[in-house]
UniProtKB/Swiss-Prot annotation:
Required cofactor(s): Mg(2+)
PANTHER family for the chain: LYSINE--TRNA LIGASE, CHLOROPLASTIC_MITOCHONDRIAL, LYSYL-TRNA SYNTHETASE
Protein's name according to its UniProt entry: Lysine--tRNA ligase
Reaction equations catalysed: tRNA(Lys) + L-lysine + ATP = L-lysyl-tRNA(Lys) + AMP + diphosphate
Keyword Transit peptide: no
Organism: Dehalococcoides mccartyi (strain ATCC BAA-2100 / JCM 16839 / KCTC 5957 / BAV1)
Enzyme class, spelled out: ligase
Gene: lysS
NCBIfam families referenced in this protein's UniProt entry, alphabetically: lysS_bact (TIGR00499), PRK00484.1 (NF001756)
Cleaved signal peptide residues: none
Any one of the GO CC terms: cytosol
GO terms classed as biological process: lysyl-tRNA aminoacylation
Quaternary assembly: Homodimer.
Residues that bind Mg(2+) 2: E408
Enzyme nomenclature, EC number: 6.1.1.6
Length: 498
C-alpha cells in the first residue's frame, strides 16, 4: 500500500508509541474471556460482591470512544460482541495513561480489569491496564452511515464486516446453515467426501468451464463445473450414500443470482429414485429452516416463505402450458419452437438448442409465478442428459427442480445408470454443441462411462445451491450479499481505502 494513503495523524501516534519502547504489533495476547462471556459472568456473579474484583483480560477493536476529563469510555468489539471499557486515570499505571492518549478508533487493544456496571446499568470492565495489540493506520467508515458504496462493500468486505452488523449476521447465518445441513446429512448416514477441483474433463453440467495449465504434467485441466461425476464413481465403488459441499466454477455471466464461483451440496443415494430424493430434500430444507428460525417460515422481502411439508408438485409440461400457453411437445424441433417464441416477441438465441429454449420458457413464464417452495418435475430428455427416462413417457425424465422465491434452489433426478444409453446421450449432446458452436465443455468422460459399465445401482442424485439457499435465510435478493468475496471486475481505484 502506498504510504500516501496512510493517515498522517495516526502515523505520528504510531511513532510516539514506538518511541516509548512499545511494540505496536505484538505477537500475542491471551484474553481470559470474550465480551459475551464477560457480560454473562457479570450477570451471574453481580450479587456476589467478593467475585466482582476478579481480574479479567479482554481484547478487541475500539469502535467508539468518549473522553470526559480524566475518565474515558471505549466500546471494544471481538468476535462475540461488544463490551464497554471504563478508564479512570487514577486506576491506571503511567504507561497505560500515556498509551491511552495515542489510541484511535480501529485500534486493537488488550485490557485488564474487573467487571462493573455504570450508573446507567451498562456492563463494563473497569480497566487497570491497557496494551497495544495493533495500531490502525486508516480511518474506519463513518459510524452512523457505515460503508454506503455497494461495490466497495463487496470489494472491501473487511470494512463492510467492521461497520455493518447485518453483514456480519449474514455470514454467521451462512455458516450455521451449512453446519446444520452437514449435521443433517451425517445423521442420515451420508459419508462426506472430497473430489478433485482440477479435472481432465469438464462434465456433469452444461456450462462453460475455466481452463488452467499444469506445468509439471504439461497438460490442461478444467476447474470443475459440477461435483456429480466423481461422486457417482464413488457409488460405483460401493459407498451407498455420499455427499460433498464444495466450490463450483463456471465461466459464465454474473447477475444477482449467478457468481462464477459458487457453493453446491451434492448427494447421491443408492437404491433411491427422484421421488425419494424429493421427499428427502423437503425434509432437509424444512428441518434446517425450523432449526434456525424456530418454525417453518422465513421472511423474504415483503412476503413470507412457508416451508411446511408437503410442497406443491407441478410437472414442467403442465407449468409451461399453464403460464405460457405452450405445449412444448407441439413444437418438437428447435426451429418450430424458436418460431413460436419469436411470434410471441421473445428474443431467441440461435446458439441455443431445443432444450435450452424450453428452459427459457420456464424462466420467462413459470418461475415468476413460483414464490412458495415448489417442485417442478418431469423435464424433457433434451434438458437432462444424465437423468433416467420416465418409463410411461420416454420423452421425459425422472427429474425435478425445487423453485422458491422465483429461483431454482435445487436440482435432482434418478441417475441414468445404463452405460450404453449414457454414451448415446453424451454423443448426441456433443453433436448439438458442435453444430451450435457453443463454448460449453465438449468432451466425453470415457472414465466415467467405464465406471458405469462396471455397474452402478439405482441412484437418486441431488444438487442444492447453498448460496441461493442462504439468500432465503438472510432475506437478500442478491447472491453477492451472501458470498464473502464475490467476483468483480478489477478496478485499481478501489484497491485501497480512499
Amino acid at each position: 500500500m502506498p504510504e500516501e494513503y496512510l493517515n498522517a495523524q495516526k502515523m505520528e501516534k504510531l511513532e510516539r508509541i514506538k518511541s516509548r519502547g512499545i511494540n505496536p504489533y505484538p505477537s500475542t495476547f491471551h484474553p481470559s474471556h470474550t465480551s459475551a462471556q464477560a457480560v454473562a459472568l457479570l450477570v451471574e456473579i453481580e450479587t456476589q460482591e467478593n467475585h466482582l474484583k476478579e481480574v479479567l483480560k479482554l481484547a478487541g477493536r475500539i469502535m467508539t470512544r468518549r473522553d470526559m476529563g480524566k475518565i474515558s469510555f471505549m466500546d471494544i468489539r471481538d468476535g462475540s460482541g461488544k463490551m464497554q471499557i471504563f478508564f479512570r486515570q487514577n486506576d491506571l499505571d503511567e504507561a497505560s495513561i500515556e498509551l491511552l492518549k495515542d489510541l484511535d478508533l480501529g485500534d486493537f487493544i488488550g485490557v485488564e480489569g474487573s467487571l462493573m456496571r455504570t450508573r446507567t446499568g451498562e456492563p463494563s470492565l473497569a480497566a487497570t491496564k491497557v496494551s497495544m495489540l495493533s495500531k490502525s493506520l486508516l480511518p474506519l467508515p463513518e459510524k452512523w452511515h457505515g460503508l454506503q458504496d455497494v461495490e466497495k462493500r463487496y470489494r472491501q468486505r473487511y470494512l463492510d464486516l467492521i461497520s455493518n452488523a447485518d453483514a456480519r449476521q449474514t455470514f454467521l447465518t451462512r455458516s450455521r446453515v451449512i453446519s446444520v445441513i452437514r449435521a443433517f446429512m451425517n445423521a442420515k448416514g451420508f459419508l462426506e467426501v472430497e473430489t478433485p477441483v482440477l479435472q481432465p474433463e469438464a462434465g456433469g453440467a452444461l456450462a462453460r468451464p475455466f481452463i488452467t495449465h499444469h506445468q509439471a504434467l504439461n497438460c490442461d485441466f478444467y476447474m470443475r463445473i459440477a461435483l456429480e461425476l466423481h461422486l457417482k464413481r464413488l457409488i460405483v465403488g460401493g459407498f451407498d450414500r455420499v455427499y460433498e459441499i464444495g466450490r463450483i466454477f463456471r465461466n459464465e455471466g454474473i447477475s444477482t443470482r449467478h457468481n462464477p464461483e459458487f457453493t453446491m451440496m451434492e448427494s447421491y443415494q443408492a437404491y433411491a429414485n427422484y421421488k425419494d430424493v424429493m421427499d428427502f430434500l423437503e425434509e432437509m430444507v424444512s428441518s434446517v429452516v425450523k432449526e434456525i428460525s424456530g418454525g417453518y417460515t422465513l421472511p423474504f422481502g415483503d412476503i413470507t416463505l412457508d416451508f411446511t411439508p408437503p410442497w406443491p408438485r407441478l410437472t414442467m409440461r403442465d407449468a409451461v402450458k399453464q403460464y405460457a400457453g405452450i405445449d412444448f411437445f407441439d413444437f418438437p424441433t428447435k426451429e418450430t419452437l424458436a418460431a413460436e417464441m419469436t411470434r410471441r416477441k421473445l428474443k431467441v438465441d440461435p446458439a441455443k438448442d431445443w432444450g435450452k429454449l424450453v428452459d427459457e420458457l420456464v424462466g420467462e413464464f413459470v418461475e415468476p409465478h413460483l414464490v412458495q417452495p415448489t417442485f417442478l418435475t418431469d423435464h424433457p430428455v433434451a434438458m437432462s442428459p444424465l437423468a433416467k427416462q420416465k418409463p410411461e413417457d420416454p420423452r421425459l425424465t425422472e427429474r425435478f427442480e425445487a423453485i422458491c422465491a422465483n429461483m431454482e434452489i435445487a436440482n435432482a433426478f434418478s441417475e441414468l445408470n445404463d452405460p450404453v444409453e449414457q454414451r448415446a446421450r453424451f454423443k448426441e449432446q456433443l453433436e448439438k454443441r458442435s453444430q451450435l458452436r457453443t463454448d460449453e465443455s465438449e468432451s466425453v468422460d470415457e472414465d466415467f462411462l467405464a465406471a458405469l459399465a462396471y455397474g452402478m445401482p439405482p441412484t437418486g442424485g441431488l444438487g442444492v445451491g447453498i448460496d441461493r439457499l442462504v439468500m432465503l435465510f438472510t432475506n437478500h435478493d442478491s447472491i453477492r450479499e451472501v458470498i464473502l468475496f464475490p467476483a468483480l471486475k478489477d478496478r485499481e481505484d478501489t484497491k485501497t481505502q480512499e
